[in-house]
Amino acid sequence: MDLAQSESMMTSVLADALNTFEGARMSELLEFYASEAMTCPRRVYFRLKGYKERWPDFVRVRLEQGVNTHNVLGKVLKRRFGFELEKHIVLKSPRLGLEIHGRIDAFRRFPIEIKGKTSLPRSPYDYHLAQLNVYLRWAESEYGYLYYVKLHEEPKKVLRDIDFSRFPIVRGKGFKAFEVPYDEKLFKETVKQFYLIKKHYEKGIPPEGWNCYTCKFCPYYYICFGNDFTL
């Protein structure tokens, strides 16, 4: 079988399997996370293989601030608008041998994903769109929302100036909200990437990494760029 035939067969298998996601629990399925959607394949591979995470100190500080931001904004969404927080979801495809787990930051008919950033983007990051898109698929919602909040040592100071009068479109200094429609093509691309990572996992061969500026934020930076580790 030549390369073209092989790719055609894989595409066919993926197309047939995309509609098989279901709720049945099957322990043999390889577990991916929605937050890994369309991120560096090598990073996902290392996580699946059980390599130890080593977060850079400056990233740890941002992670802590991000958690605090999630908690403060989450309480507002729950108290004022009745949203469920940290909603656990699972999409399963027995045919592909994989499942996608996730925790929606806030959910009530549609998902809201909260991202704390040191600077606010002009448009959503691709991998954030892919993560939210997984949640939209699970919820069967037409639209969801990405909330970007500027990181601060005291997130309440940022959130107290936010205008919720046009919720779920929210405005304020240090805050950006994006309404995002469900994208079937993006979901297929996400599943395809997870499936390809699964094949690398089964062969024990790491996939190519991104090798870009985001690498310095990765907990597996020490593997790809350290002097004390050889693949």
Residues of each region from the PLM?
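Metal-dependent nuclease catalytic cores that hydrolyze phosphodiester bonds in DNA/RNA
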Residues: 1-111, 118-120, 124
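Metal-dependent nuclease catalytic regions and adjoining charged, substrate-binding loops involved
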Residues: 2-5, 141-231
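A residue-level signal for conserved active-site and pocket-lining positions in enzyme catalytic cores
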Residues: 40, 135, 218
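Metal-dependent nuclease catalytic cores in nucleic-acid-processing enzymes
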Residues: 71-79, 123-152
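A structural signal for short, well-ordered beta-strand segments and their strand-loop junctions
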Residues: 84, 107, 111-113, 143-148, ...
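Short, well-structured alpha-helical patches and their helix-loop capping segments
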Residues: 98, 123-127, 182, 186
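Residue-level detector of short, conserved catalytic/binding motifs and their immediate flanks
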Residues: 104, 133, 216
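A short beta-strand motif that forms part of the nucleic acid-binding face
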Residues: 115-118, 150-151
